[in-house]
Amino acid sequence: MSKGQNLQDPFLNTLRKEHVPVSIYLVNGIKLQGKVDSFDQYVIMLKNTVSQMVYKHAISTIVPGRPVRVPHAGESGDEEAE
């Protein structure tokens, strides 16, 4: 697994598990909003009033609606934030 994937997965998983609202900016400038429902290597399922499958290669930036604590290597991510 690549180093980039080791950063993406915990970040997206935290957003998914904590139901954090996100703004996703695409490379063409379009802004999508919702919550991360699920994700895999290539896509993110974004849920709002409808579900959208967003291809990762089309994403420029993901902005959480509130600060999130992303677990580092060796952490389970289940403990409370300090």
Swiss-Prot record:
Protein family membership: Belongs to the Hfq family.
Keyword list, A-Z: RNA-binding, Stress response
A molecular function (GO) term: RNA binding
One annotated Gene Ontology cellular component of this protein: cytosol
CDD domains: Hfq (cd01716)
Database matches in Pfam families: Hfq
Known function: RNA chaperone that binds small regulatory RNA (sRNAs) and mRNAs to facilitate mRNA translational regulation in response to envelope stress, environmental stress and changes in metabolite concentrations. Also binds with high specificity to tRNAs.
Subunit structure: Homohexamer.
Entry annotated with the keyword RNA-binding: yes
Species this chain originates from: Methylococcus capsulatus (strain ATCC 33009 / NCIMB 11132 / Bath)
UniProt-recorded name of the protein: RNA-binding protein Hfq
Cystine bridges: none
Coiled-coil ranges from the UniProt annotation: none
Lineage: Bacteria, Pseudomonadati, Pseudomonadota, Gammaproteobacteria, Methylococcales
InterPro entries, per the entry: Hfq (IPR005001), LSM_dom_sf (IPR010920), Sm (IPR047575)
Keyword RNA-binding on entry: yes
Domain Sm: 9-68
NCBIfam families for this protein: Hfq, PRK00395.1
Record-level GO BP terms: regulation of DNA-templated transcription; regulation of RNA stability; regulation of translation, ncRNA-mediated
